[in-house]
Amino acid sequence: MPGFLVRILPLLLALLLLGPTRGLRNATQRMFEIDYSRDCFLKDGQPFRYISGSIHYSRVPRFYWKDRLLKMKMAGLNAIQTYVPWNFHEPWPGQYQFSEDHDVEYFLQLAHELGLLVILRPGPYICAEWEMGGLPAWLLEKESILLRSSDPDYLAAVDKWLGVLLPKMKPLLYQNGGPVITVQVENEYGSYFACDFDYLRFLQKCFRHHLGDDVVLFTTDGAHKTFLKCGALQGLYTTVDFGTGSNITDAFLSQRKCEPKGPLINSEFYTGWLDHWGQPHSTIKTEAVASSLYDILARGASVNLYMFIGGTNFAYWNGANTPYAAQPTSYDYDAPLSEAGDLTEKYFALRNIIQKFEKVPEGPIPPSTPKFAYGKVALEKLKTVGAALDILCPSGPIKSLYPLTFIQVKQHYGFVLYRTTLPQDCSNPAPLSSPFNGVHDRAYVAVDGIPQGVLERNNVITLNITGKAGATLDLLVENMGRVNYGAYINDFKGLVSNLTLSSNILTDWTIFPLDTEDAVRSHLGGWGHRDSGHHDEAWAHSSSNYTLPAFYVGNFSIPSGIPDLPQDTFIQFPGWTKGQVWINGFNLGRYWPARGPQLTLFVPQHILMTSAPNTITMLELERAPCSNDDPELCAVTFVDRPVIGSSVTYDHPSKPVEKKLMPSPPQKNKDSWLDHV
């Protein structure tokens, strides 16, 4: 008998230990699900509704993630919503970026640490006023590819990408101890022409395979049967989006036609609206947003405020709409937190509304970050683009009988220089012409170093030029951002059609893909000798409206003896026209004060240095404010206040811009403006 007890004692101890452990695991099991009987979410078995705000980690530097998230929490939000831009993480096939500003896992973990839940929107298409709606440009290497469909080439790329991304997200799901409560599949698919349910089913299966059967998957579409017809799919919970101009009852009735039971959800309640170059800055009155938010919350609905902070389209990440209208660098969105993360009147008004329904955290709200006006900084001309081709295109040009697109020369963003020779004398001005929509998006034209003007997509398609037979014809073509919404997201860039000179097709092109990023980062002003006046002839003979595209460089030091520097600032461009600007190799984005409405660019403090002078590099594309005779006129100014909504915008040289290419949402009914988008 004692021997028997000795043998079974370990087993008895194991059973005693196992019982409490299993009970504890069941007691602490995390669950987030839909209770269809009570029309609500259940969080760990208790009724729950989220009040969320959109923040795009790709538009806010990592340096400021915690600051922005804390401000969102202190506003009374219990969740955030964010997109995952595919092209932000896989710039080239199989080359992934998940560190520093691209570290989405850290961003989500940080939200979790701060007590915020997450609504994740991993696409693969996201819209978001982001370059190509988040789809990587390299997909267009298959020229006939049908994006956002069951096209085999597209599905293969999507399957591979989601096979990388979603396993990273699975440990962050709520039921696995993380913050992610729901995951969106695709994005407003009902607004796309393809209406391919096989594609949606493929995504549904892929998401389930990688994330499991317990996670709540959902779709978002405009609150109208037209959009829900192709956007909703059985097995994915249907949600809607609408703004202050919509009838809330009608909007949620649209959702109810697809989801008779379950929580009411507005996945994008618009706190503001997007901007386009050459159009007035969009705003929505605080009172209208607050009133509509109150009405939504009074119905017991879950809601996401799009945007709560907009942020910045750094570098080349802005998108565009059709008819072609590119979005500016600022994505301020008239949101409750400004582009720079500052508290606004709208922030406090919405906090007060939320406080009527949910407990708002106590304690101090993180203040707006201080700004500093560093003043005027002189710049000098470094080199024209044409004089720097050995630096900008070290691998050499590509020869082609006819023009090639950016994708065909392995260039995704930025600039490509197209060069040929004039086949005939043009002593009298001869028309250089592109078919309508043949230049994507702007071409800066010169003949033998003499600026001739600009060809512009959908706008200027013919330019009269002069020159002798055999003269060098240069077109520096700029990608202004790929279309992010609608049927034309397969937006090829460059010279996408043949050009003609007096009706004769131009051939024998030499094409230079320009690596401006590496040139700026690697050289930062050390490009050998500067231009020494040998282009003065171009100044003398060119139209007064244009100069050759050229790089300019300047340096400034952070003042000593002032505590807490560096601080955020804004760079202003008095007298400059259009171009790209870098500080210490960081691509701030596009400036275009000649067109507006944005006149300043946000400069976050973390890119500035106190230990050494800071280097400003500018690529001015149209006209600098100085010449070799007046170099002191080349300057920028650092100010402590943004100007993103100039009241009057003028195109270069001096003509008013046609406004409202894409209407802002009216205050009455969003359904009407959706018909125009």
From Swiss-Prot:
One GO cellular component, as annotated: lysosome
Propeptide: 24-28
Enzyme class name: hydrolase
InterPro entries referenced in this protein's UniProt entry, alphabetically: B-gal_1-like, BetaGal1-like_ABD1, BetaGal_gal-bd, Galactose-bd-like_sf, Gly_Hdrlase_35_cat, Glyco_hydro_35_CS, Glycoside_Hdrlase_35, Glycoside_hydrolase_SF
Subcellular location: Lysosome
Catalytic activity: Hydrolysis of terminal non-reducing beta-D-galactose residues in beta-D-galactosides
Highest taxon in the source lineage: Eukaryota
Glycosylation, residue list: 26, 247, 464, 498, 545, 555
Main location: other
Keywords of this entry: Disulfide bond, Glycoprotein, Glycosidase, Hydrolase, Lysosome, Signal, Zymogen
Enzyme Commission no: 3.2.1.23
Pfam families: BetaGal_ABD_1, BetaGal_gal-bd, Glyco_hydro_35
Binding site for substrate: 83, 129, 187, 333
Active site per the UniProt annotation: 188, 268
Disulfide bonds: 195-230, 626-634
GO MF term set: beta-galactosidase activity
Family statement: Belongs to the glycosyl hydrolase 35 family.
Subunit structure and binding partners: Homodimer. May form higher multimers.
Name of the protein described by the UniProt record: Beta-galactosidase
Organism: Pongo abelii
Gene name, Swiss-Prot/TrEMBL: GLB1
